[in-house]
């Protein structure tokens, strides 16, 4: 009888622990160390606070969200665990920040993108390498990858030491319009998520990548609060629709022509 009681108590404890553990994650798992060499972290210089994610697209440029802008920031590359430093981690500062100023046929939903030129080139290493830009737009129905050091609880904020990765589905833009009627009829954004809920990007994942077929297709932009609600996907700035702007700046064109 005593043995049965002990085993029953152990089972209760185990089930309780499993339930609490599952409540600590907005979907996803710790990223594999080798799968996010392009993922960068943006920090505030004065407070040291972690702000946002971003993506290294070549040795001199990082792509992130415009709303991540702060006057004094630095960019950390090659990081996995905030508590343990790799030998090849590197820190850079913005040399110049570029924002999408175009107004013709563009709404505020189309402009949450920022290109940062670093103060000096990054050295590729075991934990640092750029992610390729797309040559074509992503297809609805694609399974895409998101990642970041954003909060793992919502609405209360709990920041992890390691980045979390998850797979989400690329949805038709009309799905997001059906949920959020204030969205414009046409937009240079992507709609993505898991309609069953439980998996989502969240606060401080902003600026991080949406990766489809190994290419940077989106930048984490906006989502409903709390995060990971059923039938409430999130919005991602569509990188392909801003490709000419990005490539013109990298090529040194200071008078970038806005797309039609």
Curated annotation (Swiss-Prot):
<keyword id="KW-0325">Glycoprotein</keyword>
<comment type="similarity">
    <text>Belongs to the peptidase S1 family. Snake venom subfamily.</text>
</comment>
<feature type="disulfide bond">
    <location>
        <begin position="144"/>
        <end position="212"/>
    </location>
</feature>
<feature type="domain" description="Peptidase S1">
    <location>
        <begin position="25"/>
        <end position="251"/>
    </location>
</feature>
<keyword id="KW-0720">Serine protease</keyword>
<dbReference type="InterPro" id="IPR018114">
    <property type="entry name" value="TRYPSIN_HIS"/>
</dbReference>
<keyword id="KW-0732">Signal</keyword>
<dbReference type="InterPro" id="IPR001314">
    <property type="entry name" value="Peptidase_S1A"/>
</dbReference>
<comment type="subunit">
    <text>Monomer.</text>
</comment>
<keyword id="KW-0645">Protease</keyword>
<protein>
    <recommendedName>
        <fullName>Thrombin-like enzyme 2</fullName>
        <ecNumber>3.4.21.-</ecNumber>
    </recommendedName>
</protein>
<feature type="disulfide bond">
    <location>
        <begin position="102"/>
        <end position="258"/>
    </location>
</feature>
<keyword id="KW-1015">Disulfide bond</keyword>
<comment type="function">
    <text>Thrombin-like snake venom serine protease.</text>
</comment>
<feature type="disulfide bond">
    <location>
        <begin position="31"/>
        <end position="165"/>
    </location>
</feature>
<dbReference type="InterPro" id="IPR001254">
    <property type="entry name" value="Trypsin_dom"/>
</dbReference>
<keyword id="KW-0378">Hydrolase</keyword>
<feature type="signal peptide">
    <location>
        <begin position="1"/>
        <end position="18"/>
    </location>
</feature>
<dbReference type="GO" id="GO:0005576">
    <property type="term" value="C:extracellular region"/>
</dbReference>
<feature type="propeptide">
    <location>
        <begin position="19"/>
        <end position="24"/>
    </location>
</feature>
<keyword id="KW-1199">Hemostasis impairing toxin</keyword>
<feature type="active site" description="Charge relay system">
    <location>
        <position position="67"/>
    </location>
</feature>
<feature type="disulfide bond">
    <location>
        <begin position="202"/>
        <end position="227"/>
    </location>
</feature>
<keyword id="KW-0865">Zymogen</keyword>
<dbReference type="GO" id="GO:0006508">
    <property type="term" value="P:proteolysis"/>
</dbReference>
<feature type="active site" description="Charge relay system">
    <location>
        <position position="206"/>
    </location>
</feature>
<dbReference type="GO" id="GO:0090729">
    <property type="term" value="F:toxin activity"/>
</dbReference>
<feature type="active site" description="Charge relay system">
    <location>
        <position position="112"/>
    </location>
</feature>
<dbReference type="Pfam" id="PF00089">
    <property type="entry name" value="Trypsin"/>
</dbReference>
<dbReference type="InterPro" id="IPR043504">
    <property type="entry name" value="Peptidase_S1_PA_chymotrypsin"/>
</dbReference>
<keyword id="KW-1204">Blood coagulation cascade activating toxin</keyword>
<dbReference type="GO" id="GO:0004252">
    <property type="term" value="F:serine-type endopeptidase activity"/>
</dbReference>
<feature type="glycosylation site" description="N-linked (GlcNAc...) asparagine">
    <location>
        <position position="253"/>
    </location>
</feature>
<feature type="disulfide bond">
    <location>
        <begin position="176"/>
        <end position="191"/>
    </location>
</feature>
<keyword id="KW-0964">Secreted</keyword>
<feature type="glycosylation site" description="N-linked (GlcNAc...) asparagine">
    <location>
        <position position="172"/>
    </location>
</feature>
<dbReference type="GO" id="GO:0030141">
    <property type="term" value="C:secretory granule"/>
</dbReference>
<feature type="disulfide bond">
    <location>
        <begin position="52"/>
        <end position="68"/>
    </location>
</feature>
<feature type="glycosylation site" description="N-linked (GlcNAc...) asparagine">
    <location>
        <position position="105"/>
    </location>
</feature>
<feature type="glycosylation site" description="N-linked (GlcNAc...) asparagine">
    <location>
        <position position="156"/>
    </location>
</feature>
<dbReference type="InterPro" id="IPR009003">
    <property type="entry name" value="Peptidase_S1_PA"/>
</dbReference>
<keyword id="KW-0800">Toxin</keyword>
């Amino acid at each position: 009888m005593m043995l049965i009681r002990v085993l029953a108590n152990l089972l209760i404890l185990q089930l309780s622990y499993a339930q609490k553990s599952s409540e600590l994650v907005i979907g996803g798992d710790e990223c594999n160390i080798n799968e996010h060499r392009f993922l960068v972290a943006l920090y505030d210089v004065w407070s040291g606070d972690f702000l946002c994610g971003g993506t290294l697209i070549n040795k001199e440029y990082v792509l992130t969200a415009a709303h991540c802008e702060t006057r004094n920031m630095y960019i950390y590359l090659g990081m996995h665990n905030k508590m343990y430093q790799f030998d090849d981690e590197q820190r850079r500062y913005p040399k110049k920040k570029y924002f999408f100023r175009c107004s013709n046929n563009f709404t505020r939903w189309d402009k949450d993108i920022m290109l940062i030129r670093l103060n000096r080139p990054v050295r590729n290493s075991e934990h640092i390498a750029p992610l390729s830009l797309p040559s074509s737009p992503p297809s609805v129905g694609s399974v895409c990858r998101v990642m970041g050091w954003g909060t793992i609880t919502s609405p209360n904020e709990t920041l992890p030491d390691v980045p979390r990765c998850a797979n989400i589905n690329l949805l038709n833009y009309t799905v997001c319009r059906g949920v959020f009627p204030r969205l414009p009829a046409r937009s240079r954004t992507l709609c993505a998520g898991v309609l069953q809920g439980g998996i989502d990007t969240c606060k401080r994942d902003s600026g991080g990548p949406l990766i489809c077929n190994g290419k940077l297709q989106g930048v984490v932009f906006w989502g409903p609060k709390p995060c990971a609600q059923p039938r409430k996907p999130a919005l991602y700035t569509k990188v392909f629709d801003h490709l000419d702007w990005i490539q013109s700046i990298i090529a040194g064109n200071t008078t970038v022509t806005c797309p039609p």
